[in-house]
Amino acid sequence: MTAPPPELVQLTAGSMVERWTITKKLGEGGCGAVYLCTDSTGKYALKVEGISEQMQVLKMEVLVLNELTKRGSRHFCKIEDKGRYGSFNYVVMTLVGKSLQDLRKGTPQQSLSLACSLSCGLQALEALEDLHNIGYLHRDVKPGNYTIGRAELNELRKVYILDFGMARKFTDNNGVIRKPRAAAGFRGTVRYAPIACHKQQELGRKDDVETWLYMQVELTVGRVPWKELTDINQVGQAKQNIRNTPDKMFVHPCPAQELKQIMTMIDSWDYFADPNYAEIYRLMKQALQNCGKPEFPYDWEPGMPLNYMVK
């Protein structure tokens, strides 16, 4: 008989983890939960994970965030505290605001305004470039893994990237790119996964960027063409087919010309390629300029339609 899966760690409001007071649960994942906590300096997020969990996700999170903090990174949470308490490991980090997925779904059309989606897309790609620069891939890029900052910290224009549970180091200790494995399992979320993932190939930096492009389309239009498909192979096929009919993906109000150029660039890169982020930023800024709307305010700032979601 196999042992039952370990129970997720459950903390109650008012309980203490070292100096942190638990306020409420914010969410739950496969390996643990996230809580709102406070100390004398303010509000933070506390992530917990049982020490018997086979996948030690928090370990990767701490590794990545510590490395990024050394570089003074713009789009990442800061670790305030970490340790072991009773039967679980915990990390206390920056408390962020709503996810881009929640904000997108807060609109009747399920999409952000064009200027807002392009500006957030630029920040989302900056975050990936920073991550890649320290030798890590994210491998689960999606709107649910990006958030905005909190109004009380004056961070409504700041985009954070979260969740490094699927991250992988693609360089060795000397900064040399590791040889790709002959076969790699499926990683990530089917809707946004890159074609290489459907083929069970090793993922590289270009694959994070491909995934970012699908996310960009969804933020701008409200959907990707394969939204209704559930079969993993059909979704993979749809992504390949869209290369022949890109207009079916880059529908109004997408800046089709620029996004097509970006997709062509991504498709020309191989596993070892160092993505040309600068050229993508240039095309995104060009699209922003051409859309004829100001970059700011974002859709959730005071006086804007989504402001009700961040109060």
Task: Give a label for each model feature.
Residues 23-29, 34:
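Protein kinase glycine-rich loop
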Residues 132-153:
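Catalytic-loop of the protein kinase fold
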Residues 147-187:
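Activation segment/activation loop of eukaryotic-type protein kinase catalytic domains
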Residues 37-59:
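ATP-binding glycine-rich loop module of kinase domains
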Residues 120-121:
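Activation segment signature within eukaryotic-like protein kinase domains
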Residues 1-15, 23-24:
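Juxta-kinase regulatory segment immediately upstream of eukaryotic protein kinase catalytic domains
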Residues 78-89:
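Short beta-strand micro-motifs within the conserved protein kinase catalytic domain, predominantly
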Residues 96-106:
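Structural motif in protein kinase domains
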